[in-house]
Amino acid sequence: MKRHLNTSYRLVWNHITGTTVVASELARSRGKRAGVAVALSLAAVTSLPVLAADTVVQAGETVSGGALENHDNQIVFGTANGMTISTGLEYGPDNEANTGGQWIQNGGIANNTTVTGGGLQRVNAGGSVSDTVIRAGGGQSLQGQAVNTTLNGGEQWVHEGGIATGTVINEKGWQAVKSGAMATDTVVNTGAEGGPDAENGDTGQTVYGDAVRTTINKNGRQIVAAEGTANTTVVYAGGDQTVHGHALDTTLNGGYQYVHNGGTASDTVVNSDGWQIVKEGGLADFTTVNQKGKLQVNAGGTATNVTLKQGGALVTSTAATVTGSNRLGNFTVENGKADGVVLESGGRLDVLEGHSAQKTRVDDGGTLAVSAGGKATGVTMTSGGALIADSGATVEGTNASGRFSIDGISGQASGLLLENGGSFTVNAGGQAGNTTVGHRGTLTLAAGGSLSGRTQLSKGASMVLNGDVVSTGDIVNAGEIRFDNQTTPDAALSRAVAKGDSPVTFHKLTTSNLTGQGGTINMRVRLDGSNASDQLVINGGQATGKTWLAFTNVGNSNLGVATTGQGIRVVDAQNGATTEEGAFALSRPLQAGAFNYTLNRDSDEDWYLRSENAYRAEVPLYASMLTQAMDYDRILAGSRSHQSGVSGENNSVRLSIQGGHLGHDNNGGIARGATPESNGSYGFVRLEGDLLRTEVAGMSLTTGVYGAAGHSSVDVKDDDGSRAGTVRDDAGSLGGYLNLVHTSSGLWADIVAQGTLHSMKASSDNNDFRARGWGWLGSLETGLPFSITDNLMLEPQLQYTWQGLSLDDGQDNAGYVKFGHGSAQHVRAGFRLGSHNDMNFGKGTSSRDTLRDSAKHSVRELPVNWWVQPSVIRTFSSRGDMSMGTAAVGSNMTFSPSQNGTTLDLQAGLEARVRENITLGVQAGYAHSVSGSSAEGYNGQATLNVTF
């Protein structure tokens, strides 16, 4: 019992056993000094049985396996291997009141432990654990040593005196290294999921003590608290280190380091894609920025003894303090003055109002931004460098074109080269002379700003006009000139409108000469009859070359009415100016409501927008949607006329497949109220079944239902014969029929009711428009057969059909599209001439034993009937309005294409009984329009009829 020497004991009541036991003075606190210790019951060891809820692993003893749950305790003085712990955190994470779970005492060892939700592994001073896995909701409280702990959503709390080595922190895991504690060789894979520099301190690693040789991977985050220190940390891409305390020897291999107010970072190395950000009140000392690395020092931040290697980037302003060396020597940024700064590879220096910079070099990827009231002298701009300034700044230096300057007092600028994100704003009263705007450069002019000399816009360059602007020199445009209040690029390309409640003020750009080099001028226009737009004024000179004009229709809606007179003047040639024919052209179609607008040059050298006499291509395209859907419905219902050629006493099921060509001739087009010219194809599959077959009052009565699925695709032409677009229609139909046959005379009647859901898409070069709708149809058909000979029959027929259609309204890029209710009536008169052979199959004659009773020996033995059916179809009382327009008064245009006309139709078919209960049929037909706008085309069909 030597292990109990120098230990005092007392009697305590064990509420579990209901007895008094002898316990050490440490029992109440589980062996924790000052309230945190392990209980050891002498009675449990020597005389009383040990309960399963409280187990003790004695020194020198080894236990393997087992689970702790439901308030179980395991106190380890020896060795415990492979335990699973799911209890101990009854009072929450890292709470001193917790007394359950596994307790590793001085000299105790635990290996390969798994801690699950609600579980606690407590490692007291002198205890050690290895290879513990802690899952979500579990925790490890450490005052001893822990090696190779894995946090799979669990937590590790390293207390004073505790050492955690090789901990791996996975998703949603957290390691808290408290004051006086140490964590070495930690791998952090979580913590940064909330975004860069987000203060989500409940995952990843939080350091209040010391962290050494930490590796931070993608999504990993280390937060160094004010009292904490992190030494020799490596941060990879997607990971970051947040420093409120001290960070020493950090290496950023694509990762980020944020140095906050009061934080210090020493000897940081920023490699490719790495980024050190020093915030206000933060300090970075001896930072080395290698190629493609970045150091950012915010206003009020400090970075001293910086080594900026070639290709490294410095981002700062004259409100920060930065000192160090670059490839040209020493540089400083302090007290509102910058000297010797090199900017490249994403580097940027902001010279603020009242501050100054001298000897600044701006290389490829670098940016020098000088605020109004700021001053930069001795600037060297090389290719790819960017200057950002306005006419209130003072800047002088050299660029690829020679010397340049901006006088902040007079507002005069000369020789600027703007590229690669560079921009210059000419304020009211200012002037920019001989300006070159390169790729990704922007020249902005406020109202009252002006240009002089040669203004050159390269491909990819922009000039933005925020008011009336005058150029007394030449403009050479291979880029883009844009008036303000423009739509976004995506919206402009789709001819969308710049919507807003504020009134639009139109502006003028006046220049002596304009040379177009394939550039674009984006202008705003109102197509509501007000004849208002932005204008280009050529004053006394000439417009040559090629310039594309792109117009955006502005206002609260897409306004579109016909222009009057000469139209809307958009280019004004004044004081004897001339414009070459072909100097301007529309960069994209301009449409509003039902109209196309074209750009026209008049004899006065001015250029005007005018509405075309012909409507835009979408007018006939959308109008044809009504006709196409109704044609399909009629053909589908008409296919039933030839389904019942074989009569019998049994119910039957019929499967039909039909395809064909469908079209309408040009009969004057939409302008004359006719259906637009079109041609295309269709196809459908139809399944039909009899439900009831009976005899009533000397008549045979058959009822049934059918369903069909089909598709049609029709190319539509404009009135001038040009392609308008394509309409595609996916249709699903349900119908029912009632067939009556007078037994003695053979007089018959067929009644059909049908409904079809149409899903249509109309595609033109400029629009994709979709509409859904329902079609309804009712048909009454009758016929009376006469026998010409024993095997030849003539049957006069008459059919009346009514159909209707309703399509949803919609919107395209130029305005609304509305459909009125469509309807049409059809009368078909004709006759059917065909054989009238007995279709009784009889006995089988096949030579094959398996088919002897059900098949014929040859095709010649099959019962066969043929028929031909010529008809005249008259379409009348067709209706169907299609309206297009906008919210502008007078913009609405209504079109009512007529389907009225006469068609000659010829159908022919053949049917053969191939089994006692199976009949196959084929048919083909041709329809030709002889007057009006009725449909024409050809078709083919195959039918399988099975009786049962």
Task: Label the predicted regions.
Residues E612-Q797, W802-G804, D808-G810, S898, ...:
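Outer membrane beta-barrel translocator domains of Type V secretion systems
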Residues K2-R3, R10-S24, N522-V525, A532-S533, ...:
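Outer-membrane translocation/initiation segment of Type V secreted surface proteins
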Residues E90-E96, E193-D202, D490-A498, F841-V859:
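Intrinsically disordered, low-complexity Ser/Thr- and acidic-rich flexible linkers and loops
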Residues G735, K818-F948:
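Outer membrane beta-barrel transmembrane domains
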Residues T323-N326, G378-R403, D407-K546, T552, ...:
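Extracellular beta-solenoid/beta-roll
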Residues H4-L5, Y9-L51:
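Gram-negative bacterial Sec-dependent N-terminal signal peptides
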Residues Q74-V76, G100-I104, G119-V123, G138-L142, ...:
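Extracellular beta-strand repeat scaffolds in secreted/surface proteins
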Residues T55, V63-L68, A80-N95, A110-T116, ...:
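Short, T/G/N/S-enriched strand-turn elements that build extracellular solenoid repeat scaffolds
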